[in-house]
A protein has these predicted regions:
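Catalytic active-site module of serine/aspartate enzymes centered on a nucleophile-bearing elbow/loop
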Residues: 87-122
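Short alpha-helix in the alpha/beta-hydrolase fold that links the catalytic acid
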Residues: 61, 75-84
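Conserved alpha/beta-hydrolase catalytic His-Asp/Glu region
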Residues: 2-58
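Generic recognition of short, well-ordered alpha-helical segments
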Residues: 22, 54, 77-81, 104-108
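Hydrophobic "lid"/C-terminal helical patch
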Residues: 7, 43, 82, 109, ...
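Glycosyltransferase donor-binding loop in the core domain
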Residues: 31, 71-74, 98-101
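Short beta-strand/loop motif that positions the catalytic acidic residue
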Residues: 59, 65-67, 71
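Structural signature of beta-strand start/N-cap positions in the alpha/beta core
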Residues: 55, 62-64, 87-90
Length: 122
């Protein structure tokens, strides 16, 4: 499917595509199952959304920012800006992952979230 061929390199890291072919297959299936009108709507909504950095600047609570080392859509440099905008932020960069970190590296993401929550709320 040409839509998946275009989207996959922006969603998954090269490492994921090479070493975890099942992940790529699952994402391809999800893209194929998504109606074209929905994909179009999502693309327009993302293009029109306002900058969220002011929201982070105004938020008084703790923030966890998780980003894939090879995220082509929201690169680590943007994640760093998010973390810097927040009053209290933790930035976690997931090695060898792209934009879909919970799918590409679920154990790393789950550990980062559980440790972050435990440090703040236990």
């Amino acid at each position: 499917d040409w839509v998946a061929d275009v989207m996959i390199p922006n969603l998954l890291s090269e490492s994921t595509r090479q070493h975890l072919p099942g992940v790529e297959a699952r994402v391809r299936e999800q893209i194929a199952d998504c109606p074209p009108v929905t994909i179009s709507w999502i693309q327009r909504a993302m293009a029109a959304r306002p900058d969220s950095l002011p929201v982070l600047e105004d938020f008084a609570g703790p923030v966890l920012v998780i980003v894939g080392e090879n995220d082509a859509m929201s690169p680590p440099s943007e994640a760093l800006l998010m973390a810097q905008a927040a009053r209290e932020a933790t930035l976690v960069e997931v090695p060898d992952a792209g934009h879909l970190t919970p799918i590409e590296a679920p154990s790393i993401v789950a550990k980062a979230i559980s440790e972050w929550l435990a440090e703040r709320f236990e």
